[in-house]
Amino acid sequence: TEAPADILVIDRLLKSVFETDAEANLVMSLRENSHLTLSLVACSDEGEVIGHLMFSPITLNGHDHNWQGLAPLAVKEEYRNQGIAKSLVEDAFSTLVDFGYPACVVLGDPAYYGRFGFKAASEFGLSCTWDVPEGAFQAIELVEGALAGHAGEIAYSPEFNDL
């Protein structure tokens, strides 16, 4: 779990991993506006923060169902392909379920996020407020049946509109 001492370290990690500062600014804004649900870090054996992920609330057709959006997910380049992102995501999913969050969405590469169990959100009748590439908007039921009987447009926290 993110600790106060991790905030600036996470900011530096995100700025080093992504092409622009947009993700770092997003995380800072979500944190400042209390729109983050879960923020986890992965550390090296030496205690260096080498990975980070964050979840924030989303709505379906303007209604809160305790669903979450995963963004961003980052691992330092020299630590990639070692299962760090997988561990972060699995730990996060377990924590989200423990706290009563039954479903999650993500916007990203289907081949990558499919490894974690995400499927095209359209299979669940869900769409994103933004125009995104086919298959990039994905969803997962953390609790079986959580998305059943729901359909419509997913909106992220307002901070995402600044990306």
Q: Which residue ranges define each predicted feature?
A:
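A conserved beta-turn-beta hairpin within the catalytic core of GNAT-like acetyltransferases
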Residues: I58-L70, R80
